[in-house]
Amino acid sequence: MTDILWNFIAFIIALGILVAVHEFGHFWVARRCGVKVEKFSIGFGKSIWKRVGHDGTEYSISMIPLGGYVKMLDGRVDDVPAEQQAMAFDKQSLWKRSAIVSAGPIFNFLFAIFAYWLVFMIGVPAVKPVIGEVTPYSIAAQAGLEPGMEIKAVSGVNTPDWESVNMGLIGHIGDDSMTITVSSAEGVGLNEIKTINLRDWNFDPETESAMGALGFKPFTPEISNQLTNVSAQGAGERAGLQVGDTVLQINGQAVEAWQQVVNAIQSHPNAPIAVMVERAGQQVELTLIPDSRELSQGKVIGFAGIAPKVAEWPQNYRFELQFGVFESLGKAVEKSGQVIDLTVSMLKKLLVGDVGLNNLSGPISIAKGAGTTADYGFVYFLGFLALISINLGIINLVPLPMLDGGHLLFFMIEAVIRRPVPEKVQEMGYRIGGAIIFSLMAVAIFNDFTRL
């Protein structure tokens, strides 16, 4: 319950910031274009706080925190007095209306650059993307990837840490091939470029990582069988496991690596497992019944809410991504461009069917991401805000009526035919666009629930 509440609070904060940025873009440009703004609202529904500013605009925070809006004076929906006609949105020139509508997404992109700029100036801990394990006969093994190699680039884009590697791999979902530039972990010798055949790459984001589906895992420090965390009210606590216990046997088999424990728990949802642990020099036998979690396609795995002791990272594998003021700005622009490219690429692949609808995420996934990154720290939360802000900006530019991109599409048509698109056509477009948007939202929310 505590995690759910924390995720909800972080989600509300994140959404409030991003919606405020987006709507402020519309508001600010509208005011600069001479349009009267009647209301600026964060959220929908009944207002829980509001005030009228000196400019005559009503500023409001509403009960439903799933968006916001800017209400401008508009002759299409209100009777506008003759003396205020020049301040109505619909009376503005085509370029002014286009500027007002496009300002929301543009401000989202600018905010992302600002957030990444802060991230790179503050600095974020990172580890070198060194390969730890390669599964025999996997796609990675066939391409010649080996343990100890450091991934320098994915398809020519530098990858200083695992986050950038993961972004690069995800960007190739649905492609036939990609290249990975590698070197030894010590940096000795020349870099090698490996071509990865992706035709047999079956990647389900609900069950594994992109690199796991390719057949390799990151290097991780030694993981012992000693428990350092037992979640309250979890299956491990109910079984009597305690922090400090060392797992010796699972179902009578000696435990040589922690992965054996993970495999046993995941393969026994709601089924008893005999566990022997060492506690204060004594051997203790327990019965663990893992809880169950349903993944995609009805697959059910077990989980117990326990975590092992992990050794410290070697010093030569750790570093901090931190730069000066001006270099951070350049890095922020570069990072934002990479995220934009990845998001646009994924949208295209979604449209043509190269990427399945099960990759869509909704508000529950966003809330979990907000809570997790906020728990890690301010700089991680900032990075999350930048990522979601870019996605929000791009989604709003999709040419579907009801979105900013739909309005811009109507304006483009108006520029060609030299008259506004007929109201009936716009109304039909809004209905079709609304149906598509709500259908995609339903799929995204369904995906969220399958991942719980």
Swiss-Prot record:
Keyword Cell inner membrane: yes
Keywords: Cell inner membrane, Cell membrane, Hydrolase, Membrane, Metal-binding, Metalloprotease, Protease, Transmembrane, Transmembrane helix, Zinc
CDD domains: cpPDZ1_EcRseP-like, cpPDZ2_EcRseP-like, S2P-M50_PDZ_RseP-like
InterPro entries attached to this UniProt entry: PDZ, PDZ_6, PDZ_sf, Pept_M50_Zn, Peptidase_M50
Transmembrane intervals: 98-120, 378-400, 428-447
One CC-aspect GO term: plasma membrane
SMART domains with a match to the protein in the record: PDZ (SM00228)
PANTHER family hit by this protein: MEMBRANE METALLOPROTEASE ARASP2, CHLOROPLASTIC-RELATED, REGULATOR OF SIGMA-E PROTEASE RSEP
NCBIfam families registered for this protein in UniProt: PRK10779.1 (NF008046), RIP metalloprotease RseP (TIGR00054)
Designated name of the protein: Putative zinc metalloprotease VC_2253
Organism: Vibrio cholerae serotype O1 (strain ATCC 39315 / El Tor Inaba N16961)
